[in-house]
Amino acid sequence: MAAAGPSTRASSAAAAAALSRRGRRGRCDEMAAAKAGAPGPASSPALLVLRSAPRPEESGCTGCLETPGEVAALPCSHSRCRGCASRAAGPGCRRCRPRGSGWARRRARDDGQAAAELMGERARRGQPEPCRPRRDGGAAASGPRPEPEPLAEPEFIFRTPIKLSKPGELSEEYGCLRKLRGEKLQEEKDCDDQIHKLLQEDSEMGKRKADEQKKRDEAVVLKTSLEQCPARLSDSENEEPSRGQMMQTHRSAFVSKNSSCSLAFLAGKLNTKVQRSQSCSDTVQDRVRSRLRTAPPNRAKITTITPGSTPIIGVLLSTQNNRCLSAPDLTIEKRLPFGSLSSLASLHKPERSISPESNDSISEELNHFKPIVCSPCTPPKRLPDGRVLSPLIIKSTPRNLTRSLQKQTSYEASPRILKKWEQIFQERQIKKTLSKATLTSLAPEAGEEFPGSDTIHSSKERPSLAFNTRLSRVQVLSECAGPTSTALECFPSVNQTKVEQDCVRKRSREFSLETCHSSEHGGASSGPSLEREQCEESGSTVDATLVKTCISTVMKTAAVNSLLPKNDVLGGVLKTKQQLKTLNHFDLGNGILVNSLGEEPIPSLRRGRKRRCKTKHLEQNGVKKLRPPSSDMDLAPKDPGLLEVGRKLQQEEEDQQLALQSHRMFDSERRTMSRRKGSVDQYLLRSSSLAGAK
């Protein structure tokens, strides 16, 4: 590489001088080494000895005067660049000349690059400044260098800064947003407060209205409870619905519930229930004394009922639930005091289990454990005024699980049908009133008296005595049938006047006294004590219900058979099939008819039919059936008034049949509709109602 500078000749001369000096120094070194005993290059190859760092004047390449960047490791320890060493080894060195560039390349490849790089790095770090002038061109390069011209500064361009918002604008906007949010929250809070206030005012107003309504209801309940309080005393599951419980404005077709019972009748029912609630374990003396104390006012109150006040409770009374009246009713003693307003206000609550929709399943299940037929534990007794008070017998039927007639129908009926149902109801009431109770205690002998009572007879003597009294009353009615034919045309309507009742009562009393005297002379089958009791019973007053029963029996007899046979001894006793059928329902018990006055035969009309009860014990006692003479049935009525009444009663019978047929039709339709979907009242205890017999 040629040196760059102003004088090329001077540089070449300097380079030649340097090479010569180096060659001489190299030879001197070899000689010194030979003297020391080291093997020469001629005899053996010399070992490569790395010298120390070169001096500053020797740090450059003799060929190009540059710092060797890539030093070639020569055997003579000369420092040369790789380019100079490859072209020609130092000409002044004997070791370098024969080897030449080929050896240098092999040496550099074999010795590795580590030592060469170490030496080059040492040279660059050791003396960089003295080598720079020679590298740049020798002495000429060491002169002052021209300073570089400064770069021109770029021209300043002013640009207007972009303003996103004015100072304080964002904070003002945030403040507005916070203010709006606060106003909205305050408005919602005010709305909520207003709503709560309105709700509170509405609730207070509702409470005030409820209190006012409650006060008005309490006044109404107080007024109604004073009139019908005894009718609300029943909450038993199977207790018979009283007339007070049936007061509703809706008048159904088959179960009419309009009722207007008097307070006296309800009080009598209450006292009667209190009597029934006595325990069966009480002694006979205690029961007789208690009934003697309570029965007279009750009997007097019961007899005040007129046909006009008798309500139409319903035709299907057998479907209503009945409670066993012989079981003690413990709720009556608890509810007797009605002094406080709270007890009166509690009366308007609905009954617990009267409705079939009741959810009281416990009381419904208790019906399975109640007896089907219950007999009272108290025997019939004689009242101080001479009347005989007999207990009731409760007869009920098993359940019918396939249908239910408890619910009332929702359709109306015509006034004509309602009138016919009223007549049917009256007939049922008559039959229940005249039914005889079955005694459960031991019957004493004839003439034996219970302590605390006048005279109580056995159950076998009582039916005969009761029948004689009823028969005498029927005779009186048959005698006065002619004069009162115009008054009886409207019978059995509810609008019967009290004048007719008074007339019937007077006639029945007079004839009862006559019957008493005749029974004292002609009675053959009864003892002296029995005759005295018959006389006392015949002289006692009869209630209006029994009188109406006899009248209905007489008129129905005239209508069906158009015969009015008269008996010479009894003075015109009606003895037709209809009369005997009704009297048989009076429950003579042993299947015979006994006449206490003249022992006249009364037709039985049971020829060829099965007897309802056995009469073997009666035949053993000497009592036999008596058949009527055929001559009594050949008489024909001659009174046109009675014939007219008979025709009317026959028409009423046809209307009753029509009402029953319509009821069956409606009932069949209702069962058809409810057959697919079951009803909740399919398991009800169906029993006959005894509302009219109380």
From Swiss-Prot:
EC number: 2.3.2.27
Extent of motif LR motif: 675-687
Positions carrying Phosphothreonine: 397, 541
Skewed-composition ranges (Low complexity): 1-20, 33-46
Pathway(s) annotated for this protein in UniProt: Protein modification; protein ubiquitination
Posttranslational modification: Phosphorylated by DYRK1A; phosphorylation increases RNF169 ability to block accumulation of TP53BP1 at the DSB sites.
Superkingdom, taxonomy of origin: Eukaryota
Comp. bias (Basic and acidic residues): 119-137
Keywords, alphabetical: Chromosome, DNA damage, DNA repair, Isopeptide bond, Metal-binding, Nucleus, Phosphoprotein, Transferase, Ubl conjugation, Ubl conjugation pathway, Zinc, Zinc-finger
Motif (MIU motif): 651-668
Disordered: region residues: 1-46, 100-153, 515-537
Function: Probable E3 ubiquitin-protein ligase that acts as a regulator of double-strand breaks (DSBs) repair following DNA damage. Functions in a non-canonical fashion to harness RNF168-mediated protein recruitment to DSB-containing chromatin, thereby contributing to regulation of DSB repair pathway utilization.
Subunit structure as annotated in this protein's UniProt entry: Interacts with DYRK1B.
Family to which the UniProt record says this protein belongs: Belongs to the RNF169 family.
Protein name: E3 ubiquitin-protein ligase RNF169
Source organism of the structure: Mus musculus
